[in-house]
Amino acid sequence: MKTWKTNLEETKQRYINWWNHKGIILSMWEHFQEGVKPHADIAPPAPARDLSQKWFDPQWRAEYLDWYVAHSSLMADMLPVANTQLGPGSLAAILGGVFEGGEDTIWIHPDPNFNDEIVFNPEHPNWLLHKELLKACKAKANGNYFVGMPDLMEGLDVLAALKGTDMVLLDTVMQSEVLEQQMQQINDIYFKVFDELYDIIREGDEMAFCYFSSWAPGKMSKLQSDISTMISQDDYRRFVQPFIREQCQKIDYTLYHLDGVGAMHHLPALLEIEELNAIQWTPGVGEPQGGSPKWYDLYK
């Protein structure tokens, strides 16, 4: 693989060091294009006809991302990677959630026909879209950049997208045993989906993730539970921790996205997961950002 990033091997080594808790990576979550000399003479596609084409036309997105990466800065440790996200938590769409394309993001609405059955349909259009998008991007990339893993998400967040957050919170009390079974079913489907998508995007054993500018020499994923801000520590250890632990045991490199001060009370449970490689901290709206001295004790 010979990418447009001239110092990729040095960046890979810094990532390997970082996964082993050594050194730092100098990067950013998104690319910037101002003042960048294009890496290749690639023209942008014609403007998207509508939001549906912008997000859900694999060929159009592949052409757009090819142009985008070709015109993006790859300085320092910024990765050459196509952002293939189909909305945060797109595993929910694979399981029946409803896509809606917005100007800047994709929304996933609850399945109006959801009946508490967690079913993976290999012919579901949203699953086929994931595969078609990644295959189109991989063909267009031609080894010049990585194709990122979409932001599938997992667990309670996926179920909340399928049936609504309020209903999932009620389930922790009203049908807790059913909820545990659903968490295992979602995890089982997650691994099937992840592995099939990994086989499309992998470069040897290596892969990149569409968010957080992440690369690893093997399977890698970002994990999270945003709904955890609304549940107790006991419920987290019952409905979240075991399934995050299973993901960390089965995926080589894992990064947990701890989002907001409301989720901080679950940090002890996260630290109990020995296989978890790293925690990414986002303080949230109205709080000083990650470099603030306010969080130094947290980092210690």
Placement of each model-derived feature along the sequence:
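Active-site loop segments of alpha/beta catalytic cores
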Residues: 1-51, 62-63, 68, 72-83, ...
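A contiguous, low-structure linker/loop signature
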Residues: 81-116
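Trp/Phe/Arg-rich N-terminal binding region typifying the photolyase-homology
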Residues: 53-55
